[in-house]
Structure formats: structure tokens, C-alpha cells
Curated annotation (Swiss-Prot):
GO biological process terms held by the UniProt record: methylation
Name this protein carries in UniProt: Putative S-adenosyl-L-methionine-dependent methyltransferase MAV_4573
Keyword GTP-binding belongs to the record: no
Role description: Exhibits S-adenosyl-L-methionine-dependent methyltransferase activity.
PANTHER family: S-ADENOSYL-L-METHIONINE-DEPENDENT METHYLTRANSFERASE YKTD-RELATED, S-ADENOSYL-L-METHIONINE-DEPENDENT METHYLTRANSFERASES SUPERFAMILY PROTEIN
Membership in a protein family: Belongs to the UPF0677 family.
Lineage per the UniProt record: Bacteria, Bacillati, Actinomycetota, Actinomycetes, Mycobacteriales
Domain of life: Bacteria
GO function term, MF aspect, one: methyltransferase activity
EC number(s) stated in the UniProt entry for this protein: 2.1.1.-
Length: 313
């Protein structure tokens, strides 16, 4: 278990640290020419978590801190994060080509798509995240003289609060199709909160809207103590280098609905792509297999969903 319901964070604490870790992985993938996120490394530097900064700029290498052969470590992350970055970049390109002119990035973290993608004229991008995260990124990118390539509207609200009203106040037109993404989010939501979010997205969407999501597996039958011990062992050297990240404390394990099936019941059509397939399709290295892949990024599945006319209310 879990993040307390009243917990808040910035990019250097709690759940926010995972966004900075993902940005560090994007910085490495950018340097390797796999993706192009020129803002990733500067943002990681600005956050100031020494371990992640050193990793992002190449002063710390995965072999220094990973447990050999572990499927959960820094070595696996740049390819996995690059694959999902490409996936959601292409999702937005396809949505824009289909005429959608509203994009919502849920739990946007250090995402810079509003600044780096070539959006069509008339595109509005909404970013939703914790107030401290929104303030940090907005300020850091302004200091870099970065300019958004769309009409960017930040919505500083916790997704556990009334974000739907805040989004509408920011100008979302729910009578028009919207392209939503939930990237690196569901594992940090309680199962019932995941359902509420999908219900809310559906309520705010008109037919033709699209949702790109990264889903984590049901782990109801997994021994939580054993899972914690595996994670602690895999990240032991991180702590030796001064970086403490208890993923099991900030994430939610246990029983949860299958995202694809849940969305289909709400009137969406879905196409699923498991992580292993996504990596293979993009010519990226596979993640080492574990005895139980549900605790690694091999357990992640990506969904592209489109809302039909027969949605459930």
C-alpha cells in the first residue's frame, strides 16, 4: 500500500519522484537518439535529486546500482520509457490527424508534449497535476525560454479532488471530441480511484473521443510481503547511493479491474498492446523476464480506446 489521501507532492518527493525518474530515462533515450525530448535533462537538473541528475547526465550508470539480472532496475528504464513515449506521441499525432483539437494529459508530471510536439493550429492542451508539480514545471520551462506549441492550459488540481470541474473551468468543451492520456498514473491510484477516473473521463467525452492509457495488472493474489522484499532487494544499491524510493509505499497493489474490459463496458472500443510487444515493434531491447512479471514493466499494457455512440452513463 499506499499514498495517504491527503498527501501532496512536488517533483522531488513521493509520487512526484517517479515523474522525475521517467524524465531522467527520457533524457538518456534522447541522448541515445531513440526519442527527442530536449527538455527532459534540464528539468531533471532543475528538480535537483542528485541520484537522478547523475543518471540523466551519464555520471551514474545502471551497472553501478542495479542488481545483476534483475528485471527491475535502471538498465531497463530508458527503453521502456522511450517505448511508451513514442506510443503516446503517436497517439496524439493520430488524434490530431483525425481532427481532434482538445488534448488532456492526466497527471502530467514533467511531460513536455505541449512544448515539443508539432500540434496543428487550434489545438488546446490541458495539463492536470498537483499544484506544486504544475508550478515547478511552468517556472522551470519559462526559465529555459521554452514556448508551448499549442494553447496550453494548466490545471493545478489533485486527481483525487474535483478535477472535472476544474478542467471545465479551464475551458474543456465536453461537446467536442477530446484525446486523453493516462501515462504512468494508474499504479498510483487505488483501484476504486482508477474506476472513478475512467468514469469521469467517459462522462466528459463525446463520441469520437480517444483515450490512451497505461494499465497495470491485477495483483490480488500476490504476496505483498514477498513483493516488497523483491523490490527492496532490487533497489538496495539505490539507497547506498542516497536515493530512497519505496515504490510499494506510494503505489497501490491488489485487485483492480482490467482497463480494457472496464472501458468496453462504458462504450469504448479498445486495442491492447503489451509492453513486450511494444518494445519488439519498436526494435527496442526486451525487459528481462521475472518469475512474476506483474511486478515489472513487462506487466504493463497500453490501450488506445475510442468512444462510440453507445456509451454507458
Amino acid at each position: 500500500m499506499t499514498v495517504p489521501n491527503d498527501d501532496t507532492w512536488g517533483p522531488a518527493t513521493s509520487v512526484g519522484t517517479t515523474a522525475t525518474m521517467a524524465a531522467a530515462a527520457r533524457a538518456i533515450a534522447t541522448r541515445d537518439g531513440v526519442i527527442n525530448d530536449p527538455f527532459a535533462e534540464p528539468l531533471v537538473r532543475a528538480v535537483g535529486v542528485n541520484f537522478l541528475t547523475r543518471w540523466a547526465i551519464g555520471e551514474l550508470v545502471a551497472s553501478d546500482v542495479d542488481v545483476e539480472g534483475s528485471p527491475w532496475g535502471l538498465a531497463q528504464m530508458p527503453a521502456a520509457i522511450a517505448a511508451r513515449t513514442r506510443y503516446f506521441d503517436e497517439f496524439y499525432a493520430d488524434a490530431a490527424a483525425a481532427g481532434i483539437r482538445q488534448a488532456v494529459i492526466l497527471a502530467s508530471g514533467l511531460d513536455t508534449r505541449a512544448y515539443r510536439l508539432d500540434w496543428p493550429a487550434g489545438m488546446t492542451v490541458f495539463e492536470i497535476d498537483q499544484p506544486a508539480v504544475v508550478e515547478f514545471k511552468t517556472t522551470a520551462l519559462a526559465r529555459l525560454a521554452a514556448e508551448p506549441k499549442a494553447d496550453l492550459r494548466t490545471v493545478a488540481v489533485d486527481l483525487r479532488d474535483d478535477w472535472s470541474t476544474a478542467l471545465a473551468t479551464a475551458g474543456l468543451d465536453s461537446s467536442k471530441p477530446t484525446a486523453w492520456i493516462a501515462e504512468g498514473l494508474f499504479g498510483y491510484l487505488a483501484p476504486e480511484a482508477q474506476d472513478r477516473l475512467l468514469d469521469a473521463v467517459t462522462a466528459l467525452s463525446t463520441p469520437g473521443s480517444r483515450l490512451g492509457s497505461e494499465a497495470v495488472p491485477d495483483t490480488a493474489d500476490m504476496d505483498p510481503h514477498a513483493a516488497r522484499q523483491r523490490m527492496r532487494a532490487a533497489t538496495a544499491k539505490w539507497r547506498d547511493h542516497g536515493f530512497e524510493l519505496d515504490v510499494d509505499v506510494i503505489s497501490f497493489a491488489g485487485e483492480r479491474h482490467d482497463v480494457g474490459a472496464y472501458l468496453q463496458a462504458l462504450g469504448w472500443t479498445t486495442v491492447a498492446t503489451p509492453m513486450a510487444e511494444l518494445l519488439a515493434d519498436q526494435g527496442l531491447p526486451a525487459i528481462a523476464r521475472a518469475d512474476d512479471d506483474r511486478q515489472t514493466m513487462n506487466g504493463v499494457t497500453y490501450y488506445t480506446s475510442t468512444l462510440g455512440t453507445g456509451r454507458q452513463r
